[in-house]
């Protein structure tokens, strides 16, 4: 077991290096950048994400010069909108954002800093990236935890019921419903919920933005809880929609596999009722794979739904932070959040594998390759 864990931990290093390297290469060719953003702000130009994507220049390569740009000097020719600006000012911006160094040197410096969990400071927020992540992480964590809890709370009883009623009309209709729900993208369902229940076109029952109301700190403790769940209802439903199908069908198939085994027939032959067979014999074995998959289900909820759902509902978590950082070309925040997401994902995947062994000792990781 120890050697397996050691191999998995060592494999995390090249995996993280590969993720950071590919992302760094993509950034080199991405249009726009922090220098262009500052130039656009000075000139009053549109700095929105759409304009930067549809527009030209990045921070990482020379571009063709106009006559005015040639007069301004070679330094300003790299950036769209820099024509006529003092080349020394452009160079000072490059130095401020670290673009005065060649790309390999910047990448090596980033790896060295990340190895010490030093993600630098945000370009435009004047605060360290680590502090930003600490501030935003609880929001994303709470969404992931409650979404996973809600999924297990509904899917496990439903999956057991479907296994008991396998082939019945109940099984057929519920399968159709959860498969349709699985096919609907979470962000599209979130927009539908807003239209129906958040003042879009019909009812105005739930709030549209944030996790708490104004003046939340002044509420009594019981009203704080009510207000929190009032705000989180629509985001949770939107995130959990796709996970319901996966967990329900996993539970159903796990129970069906156990029900067909010899020990179940023996229990029935000994006179045990169906309820005793199901909950005293089948339940413990069938739930092994479901319970062991809890870390994986949580990390899936943490990653897959947080970006779009947090953006749609204006929830101030890591997903929204990453989205805004990409639009603003705030590269320290982009790479810092990417590193944290990747590291957490790798660690939780390892924990998920170890959970299988802890729940089912028959699994022997020492006998298999990583």
Give the label of every model feature segment:
Residues 3, 47, 53-56, 61-64, ...:
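Cytoplasmic juxtamembrane interface segments
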Residues 67-71, 81-84, 88-156:
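An internal, D/E-rich "acidic patch" concept
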Residues 2, 137-138, 146, 150-170, ...:
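Alpha-helical transmembrane segments of integral membrane proteins
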